[in-house]
């Protein structure tokens, strides 16, 4: 049993733990060996490494997870997928995949972070051979942090432009408008106009001032990826403002972040409720909601419906990015992460479903006003946020008010997802640094460098060809394919290499009881099968990226996209092969050595406290040659 001296915080080893050598990282990060207190060594007097932060209140963790996981995809992607894939029928595959895939991995990542007290890389000290999973998640979340903020920059630009008497995208006659721009939004206006051989639908879709504002003013869209053009300085300033805001949300750690999310995570719900009340009072709103929920049972047999449900679950739950692991690492060791994970998953899916009523009540009104079928106005992604909804608000009384509310909500939804993503990346990065590299203002400088690097990369997305770069990042770097690959390996490593029952015991050590066996079965069988099935389908039916159904990317652009995807997917096999080749002994000996967990000091502390109650069984060496490996994180 490990005992801790109250005077100097040094552990001693007795009982079974004396069967093998105790390996501990010293102040300089190099391992030192010992058979008791001497092996651990006294704390270095030349270092003053602060202890790892914890949330001030557990609600800080809940709100941070809500802010991170509940983002733009819940508002602009789920409602469209639900409508496209059979309305209410889509909820059947969505709920089933959430139960067998989304919730189990969501819980797995949070509990791993809480148990190991480490970010996305060092959390895999639980099975060091597969530490490539941590590097992969760092690559993915870095890509997400880089391109996701562009949506915030565009939203911020629209928000600023909303504070006018007349919305700039509501009228023609501006410098960015073409001679063909026509201000026709309502069907009766179109019917009374002289259109010279063009139908109402063609004119409204092709030459709307909303589209021209988006393409000619905001994006200044060039002819392709090979024509980057110049910087759009107005959008660049909005991008810079967003990065400065993110920096000051993250620079002081979870103590400050946990306070900010109380506003950024809750106020969007207030705006959603206000927009729903406004939307359902508009003519045609009921028709829109019916289209949203109307079941089409024939869709249930389509593989694409199940693929869309699975991809949406993994993307909206923010699985595989390492940020949930980082957030969980700041929990107290005995926090009930099982209950938290269930609550957070329900909030996430519930928000997606609720947002559908908001979106389709507005789209129903828009379709009624234009006299077209709702399929003509239903869009997903940026098309919904920056074309469909801006067009809809031009039809409402006091249009600038509703535009400002919508884009403010959009900004907040993306902001907390962005700064929590940055927090996840910074946590993993700082956990890698040995204690001897700790210096004052380490975190502040690291966050500044990360934000500055991402901003420089983002400059490629505020050029005339920037939208094509943005689509490359979105389609390849953090796609469903990469997230499914990541989730598959997470389940395999925990369930089959480390041991599902073993990890269930570890969770019991933290929360006082074993979770439902369903979680173990999912980690071991159901979730890996679901992940691999959807992954294979995505690869077999892969379609090259095409922008706006017209622009086909050049071969080198597609190669760049696959480089983004493979840069994370290859981390796992390359790290595994590298470790096995560098290790000594037979292959079985290498495997046994490299899958031996590396424990932190807090594991010994809680084993000492709870040995007579429930025990931390995974810390007990199983043979004379086994060992307990202990490291202490920098942060």
From Swiss-Prot:
Location within or outside the cell: Cell membrane; Apical cell membrane
Job of this protein: Creatine:sodium symporter which mediates the uptake of creatine. Plays an important role in supplying creatine to the brain via the blood-brain barrier.
Stretches in topological domain Cytoplasmic: 1-60, 109-138, 252-269, 326-341, 416-444, 501-520, 582-635
Protein name as annotated: Sodium- and chloride-dependent creatine transporter 1
GO cellular component: apical plasma membrane; glutamatergic synapse; plasma membrane; postsynaptic membrane; synapse
Expression across tissues: Expressed in the small intestine (at protein level). Expressed in the brain, heart, skeletal muscle and kidney. Expressed in the leukocytes.
Glycan-modified residues: 192, 197, 548
Keyword annotations of the record: Cell membrane, Glycoprotein, Ion transport, Membrane, Phosphoprotein, Sodium, Sodium transport, Symport, Transmembrane, Transmembrane helix, Transport
An example Gene Ontology molecular-function term: choline transmembrane transporter activity
Source species: Rattus norvegicus
